[in-house]
């Protein structure tokens, strides 16, 4: 169903609300128009390790709203990813004993699963952090915990090089594919390492990620964070 270029997305929603009073199929119309507005009609690539999942603007789950997720593992049995733009109020000092500057190293919330586990995403590679797994060009996940502690305790730079993440996002077999088919996520095969490792606020990183997806998605950044407030 086409959208007239002369209408803004807000004009369109107003028109749809008007129609809802007289059209019993409003739910189906809303779904179709929503998909069209958000440029999701193109077939998404199959997810793979190192891909980025970007939540569409209308996802309102408290955990995943405007989330940017790096897939760190994916196979036929399921998927694992970490949200990279969900800063918490906690620091590394809350989970590891160390020098006072540990209080300046933030913790991120990677998802609702395994909140008693801490993970680390970094750019350091196996020469510095043995046994880490490369998940994308220039990005590594996990590795030798003692090596990580030594690196940080020695005062080596962390900003832009390491993110400490509590919890993760997990999908069982077929679950992520189902969510993608519902257009909850769009997939980016390659994304800037500096963006993933940046310390922007959640909404700012999401908007920057939208920009990296190209021109056709830029209308997403005009969508209010809380549409009900408008």
Q: Which positions does each model-derived feature cover?
A:
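N-terminal amphipathic/basic-hydrophobic helices that include classical n-h-c signal peptides
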Residues: 1-29
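A short aromatic-anchored loop/beta-hairpin motif
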Residues: 13-16, 31-165, 169-230
């Amino acid at each position: 169903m086409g959208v007239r270029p002369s209408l803004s997305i807000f004009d369109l929603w107003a028109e749809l609300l008007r129609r809802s009073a007289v059209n019993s199929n409003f739910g189906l119309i809303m779904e179709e128009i929503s998909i069209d507005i958000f440029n999701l009609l193109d077939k998404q690539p199959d997810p793979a390790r190192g891909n980025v999942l970007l939540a569409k603007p209308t996802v309102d789950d408290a955990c995943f709203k405007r989330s940017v997720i790096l897939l760190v593992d994916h196979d036929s049995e399921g998927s694992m990813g970490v949200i990279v733009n969900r800063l918490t109020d906690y620091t590394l000092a809350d989970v590891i004993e160390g020098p006072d500057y540990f209080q300046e190293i933030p913790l991120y919330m990677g998802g609702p699963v395994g909140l008693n586990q801490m993970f680390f995403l970094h750019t350091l590679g196996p020469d510095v952090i043995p046994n880490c797994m490369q998940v994308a060009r220039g990005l590594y996940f996990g590795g030798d915990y003692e090596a990580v502690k030594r690196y940080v305790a020695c005062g080596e730079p962390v900003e832009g090089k390491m993110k400490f993440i509590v919890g993760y996002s997990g999908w069982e077999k077929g679950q992520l594919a189902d969510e993608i088919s519902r257009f909850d996520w769009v997939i980016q095969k390659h994304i800037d390492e500096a963006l993933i490792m940046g310390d922007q606020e959640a909404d700012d990183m999401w908007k920057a990620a939208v920009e990296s997806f190209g021109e056709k998605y830029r209308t997403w950044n005009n969508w209010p964070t809380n549409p009900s407030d408008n």
